[in-house]
Amino acid sequence: YCWPDQHDRLARLEAAIAIARAFPPAVAAGDAADWTEHMLAEPQAKGTARIVMHSVFWQYLPVDAQKRIEAAILKAGKTATPDCPLGWLSFEPDPSTISPMQLRLRVWPSGESLHLAACHPHGASINWYGRENSA
């Protein structure tokens, strides 16, 4: 939802809609844990990176589904190679801090975890840490 006086947010929304129209995403209905387990079990083409990305999603999952998804990602991470890397990118609230949203990336085969940014939930402000300053 976008209030009429939120011009910057409306511009971001319109840009996102234009991108989605130009490059329609594939949408699959189903259980998130089942889908993740299935997709990560599929063969990965050499020279491609696989990215699992979620935004303001994790908090709505039952704990069992969170555990299954995390286990599937960790299992896929163990088989990742430099030619077939895996990334887990999340934009989620961190209940242990008062900061708004946290942008985090974990990459395999190294298993490196990066805290890339702390952000306003709707993009009004971004404190970018990047790789060099990741906490």
Regions found by a protein language model. Name each.
Residues 41, 48-49, 67, 96:
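Non-transmembrane, aqueous-exposed alpha-helical and coiled segments at domain scale
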Residues 61-112:
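C-terminal substrate-binding/active-site "lid" region of AdoMet-derived donor-dependent transferases
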Residues 97-135:
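A cross-taxonomic marker for long C-terminal extensions/tails that follow the last structured domain
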Residues 30, 54-55, 89-91:
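Generic beta-strand/beta-sheet core signal
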Residues 1-29, 41-46, 133-135:
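Class I S-adenosyl-L-methionine-dependent methyltransferase module
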Residues 25, 48-50, 83-87:
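Residue-level recognition of the N-termini of beta-strands and the immediately preceding loop/turn
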Residues 50-63:
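A short SAM/SAH-binding and catalytic strip from SAM-dependent methyltransferases
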Residues 30-44, 72-77:
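A short, acidic, amphipathic alpha-helical segment used as a generic capping/interface helix at domain edges
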